[in-house]
């Protein structure tokens, strides 16, 4: 497994429009990148609404949760076992 030392986990709140919506809509996404700008293509691709007017309302680099450090590891080519 490869550690992603220069990448970080970001929690992002997106805002934008969607067809038939009368107000701005929001979505929350988790993305990985070395800086927030590296995540823009993924965020655009995953947005369900119109790309016109899509914007980031807020984001946070997540490095620690409840006293635990977040380490990103690439498991793309490894089987992940489900725990019961």
PLM region descriptions:
Residues 47-84:
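Short, mixed-charge low-complexity intrinsically disordered segments
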Residues 2-27:
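Short aromatic-glycine-(Arg/Gly/Cys) micro-motifs in beta-strand/loop hairpins
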Residues 21-57:
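Extended intrinsically disordered, low-complexity coil regions enriched in Ser, Thr, Gly, Ala
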Residues 17-19, 36, 67:
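Generic structural motif
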Residues 13-14, 31, 65:
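Intrinsically disordered, low-complexity segments enriched in small/polar residues
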């Amino acid at each position: 497994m490869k550690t992603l030392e220069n990448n970080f986990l970001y929690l992002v709140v997106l805002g934008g429009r969607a067809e038939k919506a009368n107000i701005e809509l929001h979505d929350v996404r988790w993305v990985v990148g070395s800086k927030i700008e590296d995540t823009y293509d993924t965020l655009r691709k995953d947005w369900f609404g119109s790309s016109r007017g899509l914007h980031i309302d807020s984001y946070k680099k997540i490095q620690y949760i409840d006293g635990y450090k977040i380490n990103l590891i690439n498991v793309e080519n490894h089987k992940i076992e489900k725990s019961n």
